[in-house]
Amino acid sequence: MFWIVMIASILASLTGCGYNAIQAEDEQVKANWSEVLNQYQRRADLVPNLVDTVKGYANQERDVLTSVTRARAQVGSIRATPELIADPQAFARFEAAQGQLTSSLSRMLVVSENYPQLKSDANFRDLQAQLEGTENRIAVARNRYIRSVQAYNTTVRSFPNNLTARAFGYPERPNFSVGNEAEISKPPRVDFGSTPASAGGVSN
């Protein structure tokens, strides 16, 4: 009977100190982070085929193609694991690398506007549609992660939860920069229905 009372008292104490809330919110952060990684990996997997397809019609756009390839390589050099959210510096490198890939892909899609044959290529149209869908899913996953980290970090900073967080090893989690989140949420778009007046290629 004594041990039952003791265990009940400990559980009540942990609940009162916010342990259950911290644990639940931390699990939500981890689940949302896993989805972020899945969607970024999905995008990275599209890049090689996109580059090869564009190269077939616009090989002279070497700077743009090289930029995308290098950005993809930089993303691949970072170990994207669940543990990344326990290392703020590694998280910042991951965010910067993904941002560079986003920028490079946008440039490549803008350049593709100058190549009507590329725009009419069925494989390219399919890949572009997949990329746009993936960018949308990335935006949704990022926003969910941002909100869950904001809630979690608020909880672990609050008294007396901060004491519980320190005692049980629940640090604050790094978050994405939200200043450009609205822009990130807009996937790169290419209008396949119109042909620019200068169609036919870009000369270096």
Question: What residue spans do the PLM features occupy?
Answer:
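A helix-centric hydrophobic-segment signal that preferentially recognizes long
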Residues: 1-204
